[in-house]
């Protein structure tokens, strides 16, 4: 199993390019199953989850064509099986996103209950209830969700999400694109990745309006056709590198990104003492060598502060001046990284859904273990600011969400290397 070794204490300085958003690329890839002609998706990040989704397509008889620039052409007309098997689905929660498109386009689907990061319960009941509202008959047995559309296809429905669910919104929105009649989704997720998926569906001929608000309206169409679409930049990768630079007192310029996607994060970085400039497709952060100030953070669905940036800000607060609180309202059990950071000398106290972080002058390198995707990123940041060497184990979590993380950090001057397991 690969490991990362980081020698800390170096200020990050330089320029890197931000990759396409994993959390946008995965639903967009799933949505290609709705089209009856080839679709090309560009700006895909080179990540394990993307590879797994493409491998899943191959198992189903769809043969994607990938070029050297990580664009992929998908022709779903060649699909041979409507089963998403457990051995692939178990490693990636986003595989549930093929459920809606397959039922809508082919009338049935059999998808193993998904895996992915072990963060709280993350139930799939909203996906199931949404499809049932559209007339699908669904059974959950033997670890599989077995869904069948009614004769004549799915019917448009008015569906209210009891809790805001990004993947739930995406799955039902995709299914509704080919349903008969109008669907109205209330209390829908407002995340930019949902908007990106809606834009992709509309580029294929769908009629989706309201994405980015809590009410999305979809008028079903008879067919969706191919086209070419570029995935939006990854706002969480953007935020992670900005926090890494801030924690080390450094300066970075990030290209091919969009400052409007993470205003809540930028606001907190300014509060921490960062100087930030932005353009249409770049962000520059400069700490001017200063130690950051502790900030208080409360996670909530977009456009509030994202839960996927919570762990990184705990790492920032760990070496900041003062004490900051981080309140997690989206997922339970999302402070597993705290115990690893405390082994490095951090002073973090967890009380329920709140982490109280008292900044220390420095952390000390230590062997630590990644527990989930964003927790791993926070340990990388901690390693960058720590004295001595930090060895991070189980970095397959990092590879699920960050493209070439060690190469990008090396471009910024970090001493980091991967050791094959």
Curated annotation (Swiss-Prot):
MF-aspect GO terms: UDP-N-acetylglucosamine 1-carboxyvinyltransferase activity
Primary location class: cytoplasm
Membrane-spanning parts: none
Output the CDD domains linked to this UniProt entry.
UdpNAET
Question: What GO cellular component entries does it have?
Answer: cytoplasm
Q: A biological process (GO) annotation for this entry?
A: regulation of cell shape
**2-(S-cysteinyl)pyruvic acid O-phosphothioketal (modified residue): where?**
117
Q: What is its EC number?
A: 2.5.1.7
Q: Where does phosphoenolpyruvate bind?
A: 22-23
Pathway recorded for this protein: Cell wall biogenesis; peptidoglycan biosynthesis
Which residues does the annotation say bind UDP-N-acetyl-alpha-D-glucosamine? 93, 122-126, 308, 330
Which residues are named in the active-site annotation? 117 (proton donor)
The similarity comment for this entry is: Belongs to the EPSP synthase family. MurA subfamily.
Functional summary from the UniProt entry = Cell wall formation. Adds enolpyruvyl to UDP-N-acetylglucosamine.
Q: Specify the protein name.
A: UDP-N-acetylglucosamine 1-carboxyvinyltransferase
Q: Source species, please?
A: Stutzerimonas stutzeri (strain A1501) (Pseudomonas stutzeri)
């Amino acid at each position: 199993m690969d490991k990362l070794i980081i020698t800390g204490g170096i200020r990050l300085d330089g320029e890197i390019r931000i990759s396409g958003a994993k959390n946008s690329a995965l639903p967009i890839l799933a949505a290609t199953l709705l089209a009856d002609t080839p679709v090309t998706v560009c700006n895909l990040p080179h990540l394990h989850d993307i590879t797994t989704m493409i491998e899943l397509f191959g198992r189903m008889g769809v043969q994607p064509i990938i070029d050297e620039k990580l664009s992929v052409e998908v022709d779903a007309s060649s699909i041979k099986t409507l089963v998403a098997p457990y051995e692939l689905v178990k490693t990636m929660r986003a595989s549930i996103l093929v459920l809606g498109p397959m039922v809508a386009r082919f009338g049935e689907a059999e998808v193993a209950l998904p895996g992915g990061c072990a963060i709280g319960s993350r139930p799939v009941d909203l996906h199931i209830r949404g499809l049932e509202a559209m007339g699908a008959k669904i059974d959950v047995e033997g670890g599989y969700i077995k869904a069948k559309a009614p004769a004549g296809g799915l019917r448009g429905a008015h569906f209210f999400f009891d809790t805001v669910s990004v993947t739930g919104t995406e799955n039902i929105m995709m299914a509704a694109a080919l349903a008969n009649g109008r669907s109205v989704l209330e209390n829908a997720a407002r995340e930019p990745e949902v908007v990106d998926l809606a834009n992709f569906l509309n580029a294929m001929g769908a009629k989706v309006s309201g994405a980015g608000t809590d009410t999305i309206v979809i008028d079903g169409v008879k067919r969706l056709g191919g086209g070419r679409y570029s995935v939006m930049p990854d706002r969480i990768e953007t935020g992670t590198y900005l926090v890494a630079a801030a924690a080390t007192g450094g300066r970075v310029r990030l290209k091919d990104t969009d400052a409007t996607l993470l205003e809540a994060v930028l606001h907190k970085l300014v509060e921490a003492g960062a100087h930030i400039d932005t353009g249409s497709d770049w962000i520059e952060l400069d700490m001017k060598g200063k130690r950051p100030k502790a900030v208080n953070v409360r996670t909530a669905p977009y456009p509030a502060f994202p839960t996927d940036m919570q762990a990184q800000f705990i790492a920032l607060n760990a070496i900041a001046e003062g004490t900051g609180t981080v309140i997690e309202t989206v997922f339970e059990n999302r402070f597993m990284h705290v115990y690893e950071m405390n082994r490095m000398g951090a002073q973090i106290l967890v009380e329920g859904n709140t982490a109280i972080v008292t900044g220390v002058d420095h952390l000390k390198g230590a062997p630590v273990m990644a527990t989930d995707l964003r927790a791993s990123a926070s340990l990388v940041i901690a390693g960058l600011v720590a004295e001595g060497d930090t060895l991070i184990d189980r970095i397959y979590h990092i590879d699920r969400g960050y493209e070439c993380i060690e190469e990008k950090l090396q471009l910024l001057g970090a001493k980091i290397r991967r050791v094959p397991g």
